[in-house]
């Protein structure tokens, strides 16, 4: 029994003494931040949807399924298999573009001021963290030769004066797309982080 306890102690010491690299630390922070953003996006969408009438929900969901998100112009993996085959740098680059595409629209989300005030700084912090990870992983490659190409057009006529029905549709679309994109970024960063552990199973 004493020998077994001693062996377990040695093994535990060996595991706990494994150094955590700066890259792993940055990835952990980035994954945690986008996870929190994804949860916030889910909550905001659920709260908005629950405030609608049943028929309104049905019609908006039908319209959204036929529509597309502004960020769909950003080329990204089409399924989990392509995601797993993508390089760490590619996943980071797509994540950066997705986060940046929300910096402006997020300021006009039709949510309470407390929630809206949380979103912008969280996006900015996450964008900075991803940029640091890109710098650490690009090995001299230039991922963003023209920063102007990263700026996407605003979401249609969302910033114009809208009628009641159109405004409702735009709010639904923005919140649904925000939730969708935060889920994408969380998936990409989680897979990229997993690549740092060769023994880990990164299957989605």
UniProtKB/Swiss-Prot annotation:
Coiled coil: none annotated. SUPFAM superfamilies: 4-helical cytokines (SSF47266). Zn(2+) binds at residues 35, 186. This is Somatotropin. It comes from the Eukaryota. Residues 1-17 form the signal peptide. It is found in: Secreted. Pfam families: Hormone_1 (PF00103). One of its GO terms (cellular component) is extracellular space. InterPro entries: 4_helix_cytokine-like_core, Somatotropin, Somatotropin/Prolactin, Somatotropin_CS. Disulfide bonds join 69-177, 194-202. One of its GO terms (biological process) is positive regulation of receptor signaling pathway via JAK-STAT. The keyword Metal-binding applies. Keywords: Disulfide bond, Hormone, Metal-binding, Pyrrolidone carboxylic acid, Secreted, Signal, Zinc. Growth hormone plays an important role in growth control and is involved in the regulation of several anabolic processes. Implicated as an osmoregulatory substance important for seawater adaptation. The modification Pyrrolidone carboxylic acid is found at residue 18. Belongs to the somatotropin/prolactin family. PROSITE patterns: SOMATOTROPIN_1, SOMATOTROPIN_2. Its main location: secreted. The gene is gh. GO terms for molecular function: growth hormone activity; growth hormone receptor binding; metal ion binding.
């Amino acid at each position: 029994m004493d020998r077994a306890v001693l062996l377990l102690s040695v093994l535990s010491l060996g595991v706990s003494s494994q150094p955590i690299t700066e890259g792993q630390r940055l990835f952990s922070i980035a994954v945690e931040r986008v996870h929190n953003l994804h949860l916030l996006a889910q909550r905001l969408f659920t709260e908005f949807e629950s405030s609608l009438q049943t028929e309104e929900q049905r019609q908006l969901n039908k319209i959204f399924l036929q529509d597309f998100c502004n960020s769909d112009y950003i080329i990204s993996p089409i399924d989990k298999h392509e995601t797993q085959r993508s390089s760490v740098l590619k996943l980071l680059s797509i994540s950066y573009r997705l986060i940046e595409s929300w910096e402006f629209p997020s300021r006009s989300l039709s949510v309470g001021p407390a929630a809206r005030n949380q979103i912008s700084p969280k996006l900015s912090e996450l964008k900075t963290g991803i940029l640091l990870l890109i710098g650490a992983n690009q090995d001299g490659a230039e991922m963003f030769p023209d920063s102007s190409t990263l700026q996407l057009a605003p979401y249609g006529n969302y910033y114009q004066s809208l009628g009641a029905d159109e405004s409702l549709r735009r709010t639904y679309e923005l919140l649904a797309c925000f939730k969708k994109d935060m889920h994408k970024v969380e998936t990409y960063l989680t897979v990229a982080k997993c690549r740092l552990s060769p023994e880990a199973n990164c299957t989605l």
